[in-house]
């Protein structure tokens, strides 16, 4: 995606830079911002799943994209980590009023991030982008919560501990481009360090040992 920095007036760039710098140094609780030094209009963010919700224990990557008309027009928000939530579409698009009709130029990036975090606590099924999640939230909360927890464990599970959250934050800060659905992401069920990978590694070691034993027997027969 092309940068919109060159399309923003200098005074808007200064305002964005000032707020992003403040957010990086003093972020809201459970939120971290990783500015793109080459493109201030593309903000990478992590949000910890709030306690008492099906998203607790997960760390969710998202991004905010500032358009060329910002702040007259709201930024666009996307979850990069797969999540089961009524207000998050298949492509990760976030539907929340502050990013649509309730937006005003006076609202800042901090307000947007706090609103998105609140959306994890209080989903709005009436403006659902994921209709199945919205229906379950209204008709069968236990099933909705189970589905949301499952995806949190699979895709945000690498960050269910403080050390995992720190590792994920370091990866994001260093410009890691792999999403949490990448099959090589540590902690995911099929990841490079996950249980399935360890199982395959054990089977490979057994086959290698058996081959060495067979080769040794063949060598002894030749003597």
UniProtKB/Swiss-Prot annotation:
<dbReference type="InterPro" id="IPR016135">
    <property type="entry name" value="UBQ-conjugating_enzyme/RWD"/>
</dbReference>
<dbReference type="GO" id="GO:0005680">
    <property type="term" value="C:anaphase-promoting complex"/>
</dbReference>
<keyword id="KW-0547">Nucleotide-binding</keyword>
<dbReference type="InterPro" id="IPR023313">
    <property type="entry name" value="UBQ-conjugating_AS"/>
</dbReference>
<dbReference type="GO" id="GO:0006511">
    <property type="term" value="P:ubiquitin-dependent protein catabolic process"/>
</dbReference>
<keyword id="KW-0597">Phosphoprotein</keyword>
<dbReference type="InterPro" id="IPR000608">
    <property type="entry name" value="UBQ-conjugat_E2_core"/>
</dbReference>
<comment type="function">
    <text>Accepts ubiquitin from the E1 complex and catalyzes its covalent attachment to other proteins. Catalyzes 'Lys-11'-linked polyubiquitination. Acts as an essential factor of the anaphase promoting complex/cyclosome (APC/C), a cell cycle-regulated ubiquitin ligase that controls progression through mitosis. Acts by specifically elongating 'Lys-11'-linked polyubiquitin chains initiated by the E2 enzyme UBE2C/UBCH10 on APC/C substrates, enhancing the degradation of APC/C substrates by the proteasome and promoting mitotic exit.</text>
</comment>
<feature type="domain" description="UBC core">
    <location>
        <begin position="11"/>
        <end position="157"/>
    </location>
</feature>
<dbReference type="GO" id="GO:0035519">
    <property type="term" value="P:protein K29-linked ubiquitination"/>
</dbReference>
<dbReference type="GO" id="GO:0070979">
    <property type="term" value="P:protein K11-linked ubiquitination"/>
</dbReference>
<dbReference type="GO" id="GO:0010994">
    <property type="term" value="P:free ubiquitin chain polymerization"/>
</dbReference>
<feature type="compositionally biased region" description="Basic residues">
    <location>
        <begin position="209"/>
        <end position="223"/>
    </location>
</feature>
<feature type="modified residue" description="Phosphoserine">
    <location>
        <position position="174"/>
    </location>
</feature>
<dbReference type="GO" id="GO:0010458">
    <property type="term" value="P:exit from mitosis"/>
</dbReference>
<dbReference type="InterPro" id="IPR050113">
    <property type="entry name" value="Ub_conjugating_enzyme"/>
</dbReference>
<comment type="subunit">
    <text>Component of the APC/C complex, composed of at least 14 distinct subunits that assemble into a complex of at least 19 chains with a combined molecular mass of around 1.2 MDa. Within this complex, directly interacts with ANAPC2 and ANAPC4. Interacts with CDC20, FZR1/CDH1 and VHL.</text>
</comment>
<dbReference type="GO" id="GO:0070534">
    <property type="term" value="P:protein K63-linked ubiquitination"/>
</dbReference>
<keyword id="KW-0131">Cell cycle</keyword>
<keyword id="KW-0132">Cell division</keyword>
<protein>
    <recommendedName>
        <fullName>Ubiquitin-conjugating enzyme E2 S</fullName>
        <ecNumber>2.3.2.23</ecNumber>
    </recommendedName>
</protein>
<dbReference type="GO" id="GO:0043161">
    <property type="term" value="P:proteasome-mediated ubiquitin-dependent protein catabolic process"/>
</dbReference>
<dbReference type="GO" id="GO:0004842">
    <property type="term" value="F:ubiquitin-protein transferase activity"/>
</dbReference>
<keyword id="KW-0808">Transferase</keyword>
<dbReference type="GO" id="GO:1904668">
    <property type="term" value="P:positive regulation of ubiquitin protein ligase activity"/>
</dbReference>
<dbReference type="GO" id="GO:0010997">
    <property type="term" value="F:anaphase-promoting complex binding"/>
</dbReference>
<keyword id="KW-0067">ATP-binding</keyword>
<keyword id="KW-0832">Ubl conjugation</keyword>
<dbReference type="GO" id="GO:0005524">
    <property type="term" value="F:ATP binding"/>
</dbReference>
<keyword id="KW-0007">Acetylation</keyword>
<dbReference type="GO" id="GO:0085020">
    <property type="term" value="P:protein K6-linked ubiquitination"/>
</dbReference>
<dbReference type="GO" id="GO:0031145">
    <property type="term" value="P:anaphase-promoting complex-dependent catabolic process"/>
</dbReference>
<dbReference type="Pfam" id="PF00179">
    <property type="entry name" value="UQ_con"/>
</dbReference>
<feature type="active site" description="Glycyl thioester intermediate">
    <location>
        <position position="95"/>
    </location>
</feature>
<comment type="similarity">
    <text>Belongs to the ubiquitin-conjugating enzyme family.</text>
</comment>
<dbReference type="GO" id="GO:0005634">
    <property type="term" value="C:nucleus"/>
</dbReference>
<dbReference type="GO" id="GO:0061631">
    <property type="term" value="F:ubiquitin conjugating enzyme activity"/>
</dbReference>
<dbReference type="GO" id="GO:0044314">
    <property type="term" value="P:protein K27-linked ubiquitination"/>
</dbReference>
<feature type="modified residue" description="N-acetylmethionine">
    <location>
        <position position="1"/>
    </location>
</feature>
<keyword id="KW-0833">Ubl conjugation pathway</keyword>
<feature type="region of interest" description="Disordered">
    <location>
        <begin position="159"/>
        <end position="223"/>
    </location>
</feature>
<comment type="pathway">
    <text>Protein modification; protein ubiquitination.</text>
</comment>
């Amino acid at each position: 995606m092309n940068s919109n920095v060159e399309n923003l007036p200098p005074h808007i760039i200064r305002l964005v830079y000032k707020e992003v710098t403040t957010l990086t140094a003093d972020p809201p609780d459970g939120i971290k911002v990783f500015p793109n030094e080459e493109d201030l209009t593309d903000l990478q963010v992590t949000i910890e799943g709030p306690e008492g919700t099906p998203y607790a224990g997960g760390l969710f990557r998202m991004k905010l994209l500032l358009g060329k008309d910002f702040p007259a027009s709201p930024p666009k928000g996307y979850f990069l980590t797969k999540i089961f939530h009524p207000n998050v579409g298949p492509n990760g698009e976030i539907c929340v009023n502050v990013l649509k009709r309730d937006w005003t130029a006076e609202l800042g990036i901090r307000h947007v991030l706090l609103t998105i975090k609140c959306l994890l606590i209080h989903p709005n099924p009436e403006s659902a982008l994921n209709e199945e999640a919205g229906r379950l939230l209204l008709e069968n909360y236990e099933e909705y919560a189970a589905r949301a927890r499952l995806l949190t464990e699979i895709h945000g599970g690498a960050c269910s501990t403080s050390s995992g959250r720190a590792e994920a934050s370091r990866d994001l800060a260093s410009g890691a481009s792999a999403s949490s659905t990448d099959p090589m992401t540590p902690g995911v069920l099929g990841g490079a360090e996950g249980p399935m990978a360890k199982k395959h590694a054990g089977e490979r070691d057994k086959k290698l040992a058996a081959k060495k034993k067979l080769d040794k027997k063949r060598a002894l027969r030749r003597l």
